Amino acid sequence: MGIFAGRSLAADKARQKAFRTAFPSYGPQRSWGGRLLRLCGWGLLLLGAFALVVVIDGWRAFGQGAEGARLERMARSPQWHDGGFENPQPILNNWERTLTDLFHSSPESSPRMPVVVDRIDPKRFATPPEDGLRVTWMGHSSTLVEVDGHRVLTDPVWGERTSPLEWIGPKRWFPAPIALDALPPIDAVVISHDHYDHLDFATIEAMKDWNTTFVVPLGVGAHLEYWGVPADHIVELDWWERTKVKGLEIVCTPARHASGRFLHQNKTLWAGWALVGPQHRVYYSGDTGLFPAMEEIGAKLGPFDLTMIETGQYGAGWPDWHLGPEQAVLAHRLVQGRLFLPVHWGLLTLAYHGWTEPIERSLVAAKHDGVGITAPRPGQDFLALAPPPVERWWPERPWKTAEEAPIVASQIPPKLREGHPALPLLPAPAAVSPQTQAPKPQAGKPPTPPPGTGPAVATPHE
């Protein structure tokens, strides 16, 4: 037995030696190259496992793509080209500048101390606004608009993170000023587009059984239905189309932006909104860069008693995606607004600027241009026709001026900028290299219909 075992051991050693000679990357004497390959293999395996966890965990939050009759209707839109929606003016992306800004982001991009928030007493809604128009800003782009006896929620985001995952992604700085189930009855929920900071899965899922009408751009209804909202509670509109909800006219207006959740990039439309009541009018820009049709919005649907225009989350690397404060003031004038409420700031860190910079620059630009502006605390309501004076509730922190960090949209006719005092705060727009522009619309597509001529779309809740 001992001799047999010894011969077997010797044979094993010989085989191991021959194997190591033939395959030096394996075994205890493998090369550094082999070890690196093995580590890379494990890394790819772990990365794949992480990606699988992300997809599984966030699958429902990613939403659902359009199909069937919904997709056919989308394909008939003048904004639809080559399988997706496009802007009339291509949007500029300067990736080199974006990466540069990433490494020079402001240390003040999020608050160091708790943000001042007004907790909302639900009893306040029992008393209608004296002048017929009252607005409560919840932070970012979420507002409750009470206009001529109707209540409208814009882009409600009550979730903790603007992400498909509950454990990673931009986290809100403070809880919502009021619980969703404490809100009064809502007549309409208006969504501007399907980015996570405007269309929140957790919020919609909590609202799916509400007796309300969801008014959304083309394609967004597929997400809502997938999350349980009844189809007859959803109205989808193209630019310049309109509907009525219990007597309040809601008009879908153009915007210059993009859309996308996971694999669904630019498969749904983005938009702004006009709320047209018997006595008052409100304009909500949604996410947008500057674009010429803003003048047409004002001419066809204005003047507006209140504009709610996005001012934050801008960057020099994406100057056409967001207005920035100075161009927001210009947009307010173009759409013929009376009182300007800056939104899309004060809740999340989604860009590299200081968190107070949007409101600081908005105040400077509004004063320079003679524009009425309001800056309520999150949760604070105000009467749009008699707004309170601006009180600084945010801390004084360092921020960059328009001269230091200008945001200037590309491909804008010079005449659009003429006669607006705030614009000297900005340098002249630089020429856009053709290589940085997105593809132009396909030849032969029908032109966009004239503003204000879009068809009316009926809603079951008129």
Question: Model-derived features: where do they sit?
Answer:
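Active-site-proximal loop/helix segment associated with metal-binding centers of metalloenzymes
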Residues: 158, 254-277, 393-417
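Metallo-beta-lactamase
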Residues: 2-171, 176-180, 217-286, 305-312, 361-379, 385-386, ...
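Active-site neighborhood of phospho(di)ester-bond hydrolases with catalytic His/Asp-centered motifs
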Residues: 153-155, 185-194, 215-217, 236, ...
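Acidic/histidine-rich helix-loop elements
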Residues: 158-175, 258-264, 315-321, 349
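Binuclear metal-ion centers of metallo-dependent hydrolases, dominated by the metallo-beta-lactamase
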Residues: 2-11, 38-44, 213, 228-246, ...
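Active-site-proximal loop/helix segments of hydrolase catalytic cores
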Residues: 202, 257-335, 356-361
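Active-site metal-binding motif and surrounding structural segment of the metallo-beta-lactamase
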Residues: 76-77, 167-215, 302-308
